[in-house]
Amino acid sequence: MVVTPDDAHGDERFDRRLGLVGALSIGLGAMLGGGIYVIAGTAAGMIGPALVMAYLATGLLTIFTAINYAELACSIPKQGGGYTFAQDTIGGFPAFLTGWFLFIGNIVACGLYALAVAHTIGVFIPEASPQILGLIAIGIIIVTFITNYASLKGVTGVLGILNVIQSIILFSFIAVGFFFVKPENISLVHPELGLFTFMSTVSFIYISFVGFELITTASEEIKEPARNIPRAIMLTLLIATLIYMAAALVLVGVTPYTEIADSHTPISVVYEIMLGPGAFYLALAGMAASNYAALNATFLATARIAYSMGRDRYFPTILESVSKKRKTPIPALILTLILVSLFASSGNVDLVAHLSDFGYLIGLSIVNYSVIVLRRKGLSVPGTFKGPFFPIVPILGIITCLMLVPTLNISALQLGGILTVAGLVVFLLYGWNRNRDYVDGLEEQLLEKQNLDIGKSITHQE
């Protein structure tokens, strides 16, 4: 069978309804969520005004992984994103581990975004307790589930509207903020600033830069994937990096970084300093829109990963079921609803960031290696995007991910170890037989190759 760039490995149960704008909505909806509105204050407290350079450095380090994702998505445009890339190239336990870490990272991130939206609503509820905020978050998650259940078109429509709202507020914050920036605030130096602290900040904000990954989880629903996916990935990373840098400059320039350190609403705080109390609520609306957009995009991607791992028998096979009418993976959406709700009922921002960073860094390092395997096995689809300077770019992608892992704090590494053990349990319960089939297949291929080589040798001797 001849595979074209636009239908390679496709799944006819999904409709290709998204163009470049729709794909961008998914990527930007995730990248411009909790990253700048929620964790930027904590990051500023870690390194001060050097936060601007930290966002630039993270964007530059991430570009290698983005290029590799673009190439993989063109040759393997299937639901599941990074997990599917690893599964179709490497296979076995490494593929499961990739999917596991990306799945858990997305689940926890959804909890963060839901809680962030709940906190914006909680401002208007006198003495709102954590339990009430948790219930609000679960209600928001249920609404997100219903939107995703209805259709992908509904999700991208919501993302498009929310992206417009958050973009107006964020761009206004940047445009107005430049007039309030004070050189003396930017010239401040954090007393603990050093290479390790700088890299620790980069790893901490890394969660803000993986939104492009979510584009590939909906590959089977994007029109002309060979053309639109690479463009959407690179544009998402470029636009988000520039916005992050500009917003960070305003955050640390308008007021001393110590005023927003450890704040989970830094933009609202700075908005109020610039324009008064009324602006606080304007920024709050932007925070709500931004985080709800991120929740929708990440919720969508998480369900797609669960669907893909069910399809490949690493998760229960019921998760691969797709509604014929709505073209959505209902069981996978329900699983995502349950797990995200459980986390949102008791989660916190720091835990989310640490868990997500560990999972993404480990998972993406394996995905970067998948490009090397893709090329060596000759699986690339002719006429599609291919990253330059092979194999330098994939190797740099692996290095830039793994070198950040040791800079995570000890709690992140401990939690990462617990997640790894949990993944082993899930693999033994569901993936072991699947892995045996994979190994048996490799053994059969090796035996066939050996028999072929022996046959050629005998023929040559005759």
Where are the regions that the model predicts?
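Hydrophobic alpha-helical segments of multi-pass membrane transport proteins
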Residues: 169-173, 306, 356-383, 420-439
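Hydrophobic transmembrane alpha-helices that form the core helical bundles
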Residues: 42-46, 54, 63-141, 145-149, ...
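Helix-loop-helix junctions that connect adjacent transmembrane segments
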Residues: 3-15, 51-52, 56, 127-132, ...
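Membrane-interface "cap" regions at the ends of multi-pass membrane proteins
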Residues: 1-40, 45-50, 62-67, 78-79, ...
